[in-house]
């Protein structure tokens, strides 16, 4: 309730941030994530990096997470299944799937039915922007350098 009220009040600021997020390069995203891993002394392994997606495992020997940043308008069930199978193949039990666009309804349905098998957190562009700490401050400029993925590790 509070979250939807916040989104309603700050819709213009969120839309500006979302437009800027859609323009970010995968190279910049990878730099931010890797720098945060180094600062937090976390092990990481880049699995895939191309113009549209960045896939990385982050964590320690005991607890690992698979993080996907996907620049696409809509994530399909095929993309989700690929991510889910990669988690199972690598024995990772926590996944974070971030997209600059939205998830198709099939993906949400599959996540709901698979939640006991895989723990995958889905974040569309709007949810990701709202979770950023700087968006909650007044008169704060939107900057790529202020993006943070630390809370997802």
Segments from the language model and where they lie:
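Mixed-charge (Asp/Glu-Lys/Arg
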Residues: 1-153
């Amino acid at each position: 309730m509070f979250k939807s009220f916040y989104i309603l009040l700050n819709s213009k600021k969120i839309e500006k941030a979302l437009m800027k997020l859609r323009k970010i390069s995968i190279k910049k995203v990878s730099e931010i994530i890797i720098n945060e891993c180094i600062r937090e002394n976390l092990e990481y392994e880049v699995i895939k990096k191309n113009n549209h997606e960045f896939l990385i495992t982050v964590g320690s020997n005991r607890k690992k997470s698979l993080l996907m940043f996907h620049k696409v308008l809509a994530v399909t069930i095929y993309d989700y299944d690929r991510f889910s199978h990669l988690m199972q193949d690598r024995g990772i039990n926590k996944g974070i799937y971030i997209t600059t666009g939205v998830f198709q309804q099939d993906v949400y349905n599959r996540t709901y039915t698979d939640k006991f098998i895989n723990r995958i957190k889905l974040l569309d562009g709007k949810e990701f922007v709202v979770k950023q700490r700087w968006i909650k401050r007044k008169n704060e400029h939107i900057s790529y350098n202020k993006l943070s993925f630390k809370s997802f590790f």
